[in-house]
Amino acid sequence: VHSYFGLRKISIQKGKVLLNNEPFYQRLILDQGYWTDSHLTPPSEEAIIEDIDKIMAMGYNGVRKHQKIEDARFLYWCDVKGVLVWSEMAAAYEFNDQAVDRFTREWLDIVQQHYNHPCIVTWVPFNESWGIANVFADRKQQQFTEAIYHLTKSIDPYRPVVVNDGWEHTVSDILTLHDYEESGAKFLKRYADKDAITSNEISHMNARYAMAQGYAYRGQ
């Protein structure tokens, strides 16, 4: 029987993500983990290694696994090669009592199962309000995201949790904003006044605002 371990520290100070107490700029590729012939299942361990090597060769230092809990072999090789991973949960189709129950149980199982992989540096339970479509104003959905945040932190207080990646944040350790604008000039103009976006004075993406109603930006 063989095993391994890795040591690293992820922290946030003064608006910056630190790796081992040093500012670290994350160049992450959004990776949906599809394979040509086997779909969501990696065809082989060699294919996983080749995928990670290509990611590194293109200049990325990490991946945001999108809507997929990845094979443990992928996480192992990211541990070995020093590639960072944002671990994101697949979204429920809609918000209801059954979805809340199943999502909570499955998400906590995932956090506990993958807790010891040093490559994972951020937990992302929700993405772009998928499965919580009315979280911007619906108090029940907001409370659900708060509960998931605190349950995650109770298991793992050491990693950042981005509760709703992209927009309409409730409680979150990092304010992440998704923007699909293709014009650099428009992009520059839009983000010239950061305070207008973080205060919900203007939306950054169509009708999507940075914060959900009733929540304020705290510098995260």
Give the positions of each predicted feature.
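Secreted/periplasmic carbohydrate-active enzymes, especially glycoside hydrolases
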Residues: 1-72, 81-85, 121-122, 154
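Substrate-binding/catalytic cleft of secreted carbohydrate-active enzymes
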Residues: 50-54, 62-220
